[in-house]
Amino acid sequence: MNLVKILFCVFACLVFTVTAVPEPRWKFFKKIEKVGQNIRDGIIKAGPAVAVVGQAASITGK
């Protein structure tokens, strides 16, 4: 009977600690996602400029 009470208390403490863990302050994957979005936005913004440079190079024959 005592073993059952001890195991129940240990299990209850384990469940409490797992559910009471706060969120981490530094969200690693959010930072990676933001870097990826910035790279994607930079590529989208640079697309027209690269196309113009390509057309200019083809006009001059280089």
From Swiss-Prot:
Keywords: Amidation, Antibiotic, Antimicrobial, Immunity, Innate immunity, Secreted, Signal
PROSITE patterns xref list: CECROPIN
Principal localisation: secreted
Signal peptide positions on this chain: 1-20
Residue stretch(es) of the prosequence: 21-24
InterPro entries in alphabetical order: Cecropin
Residues bearing PTM Threonine amide: 60
GO CC field: extracellular region
Subcellular location: Secreted
One GO BP: defense response to Gram-positive bacterium
Function, as annotated: Has antibacterial activity.
The family this protein is said to belong to: Belongs to the cecropin family.
Stated name of the protein: Cecropin-A
Species this protein is from: Trichoplusia ni (Cabbage looper)
Lineage start: Eukaryota, Metazoa, Ecdysozoa, Arthropoda, Hexapoda
